[in-house]
Amino acid sequence: MKKLLALIASFAIMLVTASAFVDKRQEASLGEESPMLVVNSGDSLVSLDSFQGCWVILSFWSAADARSRMTQNDVAVFMRSHKLPAQAGKVEVVSVNLDRSERLMEEIVKIDNLDENSQFRIDNASMAEYAIQAYRMNEGLRTFVINPEGKLVAADPSVDDLKRIIS
């Protein structure tokens, strides 16, 4: 009986110790590397790591979150209307839709005149939950700026913030 209790206690201590070591890339923090993210792009998958070396405006949205949808439009207007200086480097927009319906997303992209090439999806519920937790979006969907080194440099930037950060 003592051995069983010792074994259970050892297992409990091991569990507590193991959970104390969290991969820093699993939670978004400004100044740290962006959490890993893989999204659907048509018939293929795209990793956020594939944009290393570029500025990335990472924006999460859904039809049900009006603020996130308005942010999509702000980012689209920013990208169309602001000539970025050559020294800013390449800027990519990764707009991640969390709606279950791909058709709904496609309709909104057309209605809002968004760039189809920058639209991606997470259609798996567990991956969507991971993204919500990793990017700390418990109170609504958000937008982030990632520098060419892959570090988060801004959260929920305004158009003026985007101009200042990227140029």
Residue ranges and their predicted role:
Residues 52-56, 87-91, 115-117, 148:
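Loop/turn elements at helix/coil->beta-strand transitions in domains of secreted/extracellular proteins
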Residues 69-112, 126-131:
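Structural microenvironment flanking redox-active thiols in thiol-disulfide oxidoreductases
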Residues 106-142, 148:
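Short, internal strand/loop/helix patches
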Residues 83, 139-167:
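Thiol-/selenol-based redox modules, centered on thioredoxin-like
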Residues 1-35, 167:
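N-terminal targeting signals for export/organelle localization
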Residues 20-49, 70-73, 119:
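N-terminal "domain-start" segment that seeds a small globular fold
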Residues 47-72, 92-94:
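Short active-site neighborhood of thiol/selenol oxidoreductases, capturing the structured segment around
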